[in-house]
A protein has these predicted regions:
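Beta-strand-rich modules
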Residues: 408-446
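Extracellular carbohydrate recognition and processing domains
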Residues: 287-319
Length: 465
């Protein structure tokens, strides 16, 4: 009934049935699709009660064999059955998994994987960098390459070794600043606009599909996120190491399905890389074959952040299925480093509309120099997210980024040299094509000057070990 009703209101839903109840006899774990629970997956005409089946965690090869047989008997795909992996108790990629019970004679999965509590990764480290290292082990494996083999002394297969890649980079517009949703600073066009740590998950960008799929005729460059230097947001991609002479190497970054028109352009923000040639290359075949005509663009390398733009109109009518970087050098280069800050492929060169009706909906003063507030405004469909700034003297300073149009500001501040009883705020839309809009502005009314209150004394240092 719920599926029928959801379809009527144009909001269809899908159900995954957890292997905890039988059809007739109450609670019981079969650890697979079996004779007591198959009814939840049995077709009724062209309809199915449950779209997927999540098998309890104690499956074996024999139980998985039976799940495959039962799914086929029901006329369902065996991959509608998910073998549950209990990652919370096991400690993410430290979980012991009976992999042999999942593979066929060709080493392919016989069932889909049901990942219970994959966010357990967050408990394995203390910093953002720790998180990404553990995330890469979980999804890519200890070998650090989704195409590589699992090390013999390790139990964990990276998830990317077992499933085909999929991508959100589709259509005619794709842009990314590689934003992980957190950072030590916030950069705007290569300059620091917020010099403190932040965590705004809703501004996360599309991260590389493969981390890291590299080939090299010599030693591979070390690929990583760089939280010390970025073009926009909190981080860039960094490729660093020592280059031996006459080295060629590729870093395959994205699986895509991008349509190219006669108006499509490529924009790339980058820094460093001198001593080599760096190219952005496109695969225009589904099998990620590179080397097509007009599908290779050389970047102009400098020591500072710079932005290259290329016309891709010669590829009009084709699709881009993959994006990679290629590094070539003849002489050896020590302490080599290249940062990639932004990558955009789009046929939309229009700046997004500016937000409107910006107001301070609520505010609460802590003293004459610090307050908290909620701002509201009207956004637009072309925006990916919004940046909120405060003006202190002649300087605009970022307060936060968000995809919402009602935004909490935990700290609005002004310096001791500020004059007057009001302060200007602004909101800028960052478009889905990577371009910024004009700003919407409003005034934050402090109702007092900075001399009207004193600041609290800082807390005494805790010297107790």
């Amino acid at each position: 009934y719920t599926k029928e009703y959801a379809a009527q209101v144009n909001h269809p839903v899908k159900y995954s049935w957890y292997d905890a109840m039988t059809y007739e006899y109450g609670r019981y774990h079969e650890d697979g699709l079996g004779e007591y629970n198959y009814q939840f997956m049995e077709k009724e005409g062209d309809k199915v009660p449950a779209d997927h089946f999540f098998a309890n965690f104690n499956w074996t090869k024999e139980k998985n064999d039976y799940s495959v047989t039962m799914a086929q008997w029901l006329g369902r795909s065996q991959y509608d059955v998910f073998a549950g992996l209990e990652l919370q108790q096991g400690g993410s990629y430290k979980t012991k998994v009976k992999w042999d019970a999942l593979f066929d004679e060709n080493g392919k999965l016989r069932l889909s994987l049901g990942l219970f509590a994959p966010d357990t990764i967050t408990s394995l480290g203390k910093t953002g960098e720790d998180y990404h290292k553990n995330e890469n082990i979980f999804f890519t494996g200890y070998q650090g390459d989704p195409t590589g083999q699992k090390p013999e002394d390790k139990d964990w297969y990276g998830i990317a070794n077992l499933v085909a890649d999929r991508t959100p980079a589709v259509g005619r517009t794709f842009t990314t600043s590689f934003n992980t949703g957190h950072g030590k600073k916030w950069f705007v066009d290569g300059k620091v606009s917020k010099d403190s740590e932040w965590n705004y998950r809703s501004v996360s960008g599309i991260l590389p599909t493969w981390r890291w799929w590299q080939t090299s005729s010599g030693t591979k460059l070390q690929a990583d996120y760089d939280f010390e230097d970025a073009y926009n947001g909190g981080n860039s991609l960094k490729f660093a190491g020592n280059l031996a002479e006459n080295t060629n190497q590729d870093v395959r970054l994205y699986s895509t399905k991008l349509e190219v028109t006669d108006k499509t352009k490529l924009r790339v923000a980058h820094k460093g890389g001198k001593g080599s040639k760096v190219y952005v290359e496109f695969a225009t075949q589904k099998n990620y074959t590179y080397g097509g005509e007009n599908a290779r663009k050389e970047l102009t390398l400098t020591d500072d952040w710079t932005k290259d733009e290329f016309d891709l109109g010669e590829l009009a009518g084709q699709k881009i299925y993959g994006i990679k970087l290629t590094f070539e050098n003849t002489a050896a280069v020590g302490d080599y480093q290249f940062n990639l800050g932004e990558l955009t492929v789009t046929d939309n060169q229009e700046t997004p509309q500016a937000p409107t009706a910006l107001t301070v909906a609520k505010q609460s003063l802590k003293n004459a120099q610090e307050a908290e507030a909620i701002v509201q405004f009207t956004g637009n469909k072309d925006a990916d997210f919004y940046e909120v700034y405060e003006k202190d003297g002649d300087t605009w300073r970022l307060l936060t980024g968000s995809s919402a149009t009602t935004i909490y500001l935990p700290k609005v501040s002004r310096s001791a040299s500020a004059t007057g009883a009001s302060q200007e705020l602004k909101v800028v839309a960052v478009g889905k094509n990577g371009l910024r809009s004009e700003a919407a502005t409003t005034n934050f009314d402090w109702g007092m000057t900075v001399q009207d209150t004193s600041l609290p004394r800082p807390l005494a240092e805790n010297i107790v070990p």
